[in-house]
C-alpha cells in the first residue's frame, strides 16, 4: 500500500471512492481511503487478489479454510471483522455481482454469500481503492464495513507478460493420538513431515490497443494451474473390520496420512477487457467484460474401509471423496457519460453472473451397494445481477461556502436472480433404508430443493459536498431503496474534515446503513436423508418461506441495519504521513444460519403438524446484534538517499473487537417442548464465539520497499494476533497464538523490458498451533480453519516480467 498522494490514481468523472467530487484526491477526503497499486499487488508475491489485499490492508483478513465443501474453492474475506457480504465491491465504481455460493459450513463467514475478488485478474487492475467506512447512503446495500473499488487499466498501447512459478517447501510437526489396545500399528505421539507440494504456475498478460483513434482497448488474460497441498494429520484410528476378532494385517501398512487437508487443486482461466472511446461534444463511451472458468478439486473426510458409509466391494481400503466444483463467472458493462448543461451525466448497464456446479468424484452412494456409481453430478446453483444506473453531478456557486457546492443525484435499478439445479437421481436417492443416502461427502440437490426466484431493487440518492470554510469540508448523503421482496430502507451519512494546518486534520462521520438479505440466504435449500428405525427422515437447510421452516420459527428475512461512527486524524510530519481512524459499528438483526434443530422432540412436533418424514434442520434468521469497535493506523515514510537508493516504509496496524449483544431465541412453540434449562439454542456458543473471537483482535504489518537502479527488494513482516477456535464447551476451545510471518522478494531489471524476481512468502515457515490429539478425533485435520493465514507453510517462487 502506498500513500494516496503518491498513487496518482486518475479518478474518473464522478470522483473517487467515498466522494463524488471529480477532482478530490483520496488524501483530501473526509473518510479513510487506501490505495493499493498494481505494483504493490505484483510485489506481494501471491497469485490471489484477496491474499494480496490481506497483506496490504490493516483490517482485511483472508482465512483459507479446508474440508469446507465449496468454500474451499470460493473463499470469503473480511473487513473490520464483519461478515464477507458486509463489504461492497465495485469495479470502476459500478456494483460487482456476488458469487452464487453461500457459506454454510463451520468457517469464518458462515452464512454469507460474498463477491469473489479472485474472479478479477491482477493484470487488469490499475489500482484498488479501499474505503474503510460505511457508505450505504452513497452506494446502497452491503457497504457497512466499507467499499472496495477496483480500477481497471486504461491503456491504448504497451503491454506486459508475467510468468510466475512457485511451490511449497515446508515442514510441520503435529501430535498424534493413541492406537487402540492390542493394535498392530504404532502411534508415534508426535510426527514431523517434510513436504514439497502446491506447485503453482501463473501466466498474466495485458495489452493496450488503440480504439478508433483516440480510444483504448485494454485486454488482460490470466491462467493459473495450482496443485493441491496436503497438511493432513496421522489417522490413528482402526481402518479395517476385525478378522476373527483380530486387527487386519493391512492396518500395519496402510498410509495413515490419508486426507487432502490444504489448498485445493485449481485450474483457472480468466479474460478481462476494458474499453473507452470519446464520442465528441464531451461525450464518451466505456465498458468492460470478463469471463472466468475455474475447475477445482478438494476433499472431504476420509471414509475408512470399516465405515458404514463405505462399500467394501468398491473401496476395499476405504476412500477419500473428492468435491470438484466447476465455477463459471461472466460480467459485462456498457455506459456513456456526457455533458448536459452544467451536469456531468453518466448512464450504464452492468450484468454479472456466477454459476457453481458440483461433480463428486471417487465416492459412492452407500445405499446402492456394489452397483453404485463412483462419480456423480450433484447439481448446483447460480446467481445473476443486472444493474441500470443513471447519475448526474454538478457544482453550484451558492456564494455561501468557501467552494462551490457539489451536488450528485442518481437512480439505480437492480434485478437479481437465483436458482438451484437438482443433481442426477443417484446423487441423492436411497436404495437401502439401512444405509446413508446420496453421494458421500456431498449429496446432490434434490428436486424439492430446486428454486428459481428473482427480485428488483430500486434506489435513488442525493449527495452534497463543499468546503464550508477554507478549512472545514462537509458532506451529506441520503439514499432510499425499495425491494420487491422485503420492503424499503432509508440511509443517511454526514462527514466532516477540519484542516487545522496544511499538515494536520481531523475527520469523522456518522451514518446509518443496511444490507438486504441476499437471494441465497432467502432461497438456499439442501437435503440430506437419515434413516431412523428404518424410516427415512430429511434433515434440511430450509428456505425461510418453507412451511416446515415456519413451523420451526422461521420468519421472512428483513434487512440488517447498522449505525457507524468514525473519528480520525491525518498528519504529514515532514516526509512521513500518518492516519489514525477509530470506528464503532452497531449492527442490528444480522442474518445468520441457525443451528441444526434435529432433536427427537422437534421431529415429533413436526409430525404433529402433518410434516411426516422431516427430522428438522436449519434456516436463516435475523436476530443477532453486535457491536464492533476498532482502530486503524497507517504510516508511510519515503526515504531518498544519495547512494543507497529509495526506501518506502509502510507500517499498518488494526485493533478490532466484536461483541454479540443479542441472539435470536427459539420460538415459544419449540421452547415448550424441552425441560427448563435444556432448551437448545437457535444460535449457539460456537457461532457466537466465532463472531467475537474467530478473527484476530489485532494485526500489524511492516513493509519495506527498496529500489536502486536496476535492483529492488521487498521485505514484509505481518503479525497476526490471537484467534479462538471455539468448541461446544469451554474445555474444547482452542486458542491460536499470535504468529509473525515474514515475506522477502528480490528484483532485478535485466533491461528496460525484462524484470526477474525471486521470493519467499512465509520465509520462516510458520504454522498455526496444531490441535492437541484430544481435539483432533479423526487425526485428519491437525490445524484450525480459523487460522488467519492458512496452514500451507513456506512458498518459494520466481517471476519473470516482460514489457512491450
Regions found by a protein language model. Give the residues of each.
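Extracytoplasmic beta-strand/coil segments of soluble accessory domains associated
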Residues: 22-23, 54-100, 142, 146
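Gram-negative outer-membrane beta-barrel transporters
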Residues: 409, 577, 582-727
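C-terminal beta-signal and adjacent terminal beta-strands/loops
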Residues: 99, 587, 657-658, 717-726, ...
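N-terminal periplasmic "start-of-domain" segments of outer-membrane beta-barrel proteins
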Residues: 13-44, 71, 100-110
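N-terminal periplasmic accessory domains that precede
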Residues: 49-52, 56, 75-77, 115-118, ...
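Short acidic/polar hinge/loop motifs at secondary-structure boundaries
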Residues: 94-132, 178-182, 195
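Transmembrane beta-barrel wall of Gram-negative outer-membrane proteins
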Residues: 157-160, 181-317, 321-339, 749
Amino acid at each position: 500500500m502506498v500513500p494516496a498522494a503518491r498513487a496518482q490514481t486518475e479518478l474518473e468523472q464522478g470522483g473517487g471512492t467515498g466522494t463524488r467530487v471529480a477532482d478530490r484526491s483520496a488524501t483530501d477526503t473526509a473518510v479513510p481511503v487506501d490505495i493499493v497499486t498494481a505494483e504493490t499487488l505484483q510485489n506481494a508475491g501471491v497469485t490471489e487478489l484477496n491474499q494480496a489485499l490481506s497483506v496490504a490492508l490493516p483490517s482485511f483478513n483472508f482465512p483459507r479454510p479446508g474440508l469446507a465443501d465449496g468454500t474451499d474453492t470460493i473463499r470469503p474475506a473480511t473487513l473490520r471483522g464483519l461478515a464477507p457480504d458486509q463489504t461492497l465491491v465495485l469495479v470502476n465504481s459500478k456494483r460487482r455481482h456476488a458469487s452464487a455460493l453461500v457459506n454454510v459450513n463451520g468457517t469464518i463467514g458462515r452464512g454469507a454469500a460474498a463477491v469473489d475478488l479472485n474472479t478479477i485478474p491482477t493484470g487488469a487492475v490499475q489500482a484498488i481503492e479501499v474505503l474503510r467506512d460505511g457508505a450505504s447512503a452513497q452506494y446502497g446495500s452491503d457497504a457497512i464495513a466499507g467499499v472496495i473499488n477496483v480500477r481497471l487499466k486504461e491503456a491504448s498501447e504497451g503491454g506486459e507478460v508475467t510468468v510466475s512459478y512457485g511451490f511449497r517447501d515446508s515442514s510441520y510437526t503435529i501430535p498424534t493420538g493413541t492406537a487402540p489396545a492390542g493394535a498392530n500399528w504404532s502411534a508415534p505421539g508426535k510426527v514431523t513431515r517434510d513436504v514439497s507440494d502446491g506447485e503453482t504456475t501463473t501466466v498474466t498478460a495485458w495489452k493496450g490497443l488503440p480504439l478508433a483513434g483516440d480510444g483504448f482497448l485494454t485486454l488482460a488474460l490470466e491462467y493459473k494451474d495450482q496443485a493441491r497441498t496436503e497438511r493432513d494429520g496421522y489417522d490413528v484410528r482402526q481402518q479395517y473390520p476385525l478378522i476373527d476378532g483380530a486387527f487386519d494385517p493391512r492396518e500395519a501398512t496402510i498410509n495413515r496420512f490419508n486426507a487432502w487437508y490444504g489448498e485445493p487443486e485449481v485450474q483457472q482461466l480468466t479474460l478481462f477487457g476494458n474499453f473507452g472511446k470519446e464520442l465528441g461534444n464531451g461525450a464518451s463511451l466505456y465498458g468492460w467484460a470478463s469471463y472466468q472458468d475455474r475447475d477445482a478439486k478438494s476433499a472431504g473426510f476420509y471414509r475408512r474401509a470399516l465405515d458404514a458409509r463405505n462399500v467394501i466391494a468398491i473401496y476395499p481400503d476405504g476412500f477419500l471423496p473428492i468435491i470438484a466444483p466447476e465455477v463459471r463467472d461472466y460480467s459485462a458493462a456498457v455506459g456513456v457519460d456526457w455533458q448536459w448543461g452544467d451536469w456531468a451525466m453518466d448512464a450504464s448497464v452492468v450484468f454479472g453472473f456466477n454459476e457453481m456446479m458440483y461433480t463428486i468424484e471417487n465416492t459412492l452412494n452407500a445405499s446402492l451397494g456394489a452397483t453404485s456409481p463412483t462419480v456423480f453430478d450433484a447439481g448446483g446453483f447460480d446467481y445473476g445481477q443486472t444493474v441500470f444506473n443513471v447519475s448526474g453531478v454538478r457544482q453550484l456557486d451558492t456564494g455561501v461556502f468557501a467552494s462551490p457546492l457539489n451536488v450528485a443525484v442518481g437512480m439505480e435499478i437492480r434485478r437479481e436472480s437465483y436458482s438451484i439445479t437438482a443433481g442426477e437421481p443417484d446423487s441423492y436417492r436411497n436404495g437401502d433404508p439401512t444405509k446413508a443416502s446420496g453421494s458421500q461427502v456431498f449429496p446432490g440437490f434434490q428436486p424439492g430443493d430446486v428454486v428459481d426466484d428473482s427480485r428488483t431493487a430500486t434506489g435513488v440518492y442525493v449527495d452534497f459536498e463543499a468546503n464550508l470554510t477554507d478549512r472545514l469540508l462537509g458532506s451529506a448523503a441520503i439514499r432510499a431503496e425499495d425491494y420487491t421482496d422485503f420492503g424499503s430502507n432509508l440511509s443517511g451519512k454526514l462527514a466532516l474534515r477540519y484542516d487545522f494546518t496544511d499538515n494536520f486534520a481531523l475527520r469523522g462521520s456518522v451514518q446509518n446503513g443496511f444490507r438486504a438479505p441476499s437471494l441465497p440466504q432467502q432461497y438456499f435449500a439442501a437435503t440430506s436423508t437419515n434413516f431412523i428405525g428404518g424410516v427415512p427422515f430429511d434433515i434440511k437447510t430450509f428456505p425461510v418461506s418453507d412451511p416446515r421452516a415456519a413451523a420451526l420459527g422461521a420468519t421472512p428475512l428483513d434487512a440488517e441495519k447498522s449505525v457507524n461512527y468514525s473519528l480520525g486524524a491525518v498528519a504529514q510530519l515532514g516526509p512521513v504521513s500518518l492516519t489514525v481512524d477509530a470506528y464503532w459499528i452497531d449492527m442490528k438483526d444480522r442474518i445468520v444460519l441457525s443451528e441444526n434443530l434435529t432433536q427427537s422432540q422437534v421431529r415429533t412436533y413436526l409430525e404433529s403438524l402433518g410434516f411426516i418424514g422431516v427430522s428438522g434442520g436449519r434456516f436463516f434468521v435475523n436476530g443477532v446484534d453486535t457491536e464492533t469497535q476498532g482502530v486503524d493506523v497507517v504510516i508511510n515514510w519515503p526515504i531518498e538517499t544519495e547512494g543507497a537508493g529509495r526506501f518506502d516504509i509502510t507500517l499498518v496496524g488494526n485493533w478490532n473487537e466484536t461483541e454479540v449483544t443479542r441472539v435470536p431465541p427459539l420460538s415459544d412453540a419449540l421452547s415448550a417442548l424441552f425441560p427448563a434449562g435444556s432448551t437448545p439454542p437457535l444460535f449457539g456458543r460456537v457461532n457466537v464465539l466465532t463472531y467475537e473471537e474467530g478473527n484476530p483482535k489485532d494485526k500489524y504489518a511492516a513493509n519495506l520497499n527498496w529500489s536502486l537502479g536496476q535492483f529492488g527488494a521487498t521485505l514484509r513482516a505481518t503479525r497476526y494476533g490471537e484467534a479462538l477456535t471455539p468448541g461446544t464447551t469451554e474445555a474444547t476451545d482452542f486458542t491460536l497464538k499470535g504468529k509473525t510471518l515474514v515475506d522477502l522478494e528480490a528484483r532485478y531489471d535485466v533491461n528496460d523490458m525484462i524484470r526477474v524476481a525471486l521470493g519467499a512468502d512465509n520465509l520462516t515457515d510458520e504454522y498455526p498451533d496444531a490441535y492437541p490429539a484430544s481435539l483432533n478425533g479423526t487425526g485428519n485435520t491437525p490445524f484450525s480453519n480459523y487460522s488467519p493465514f492458512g496452514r500451507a507453510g513456506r512458498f518459494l517462487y520466481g517471476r519473470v516480467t516482460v514489457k512491450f
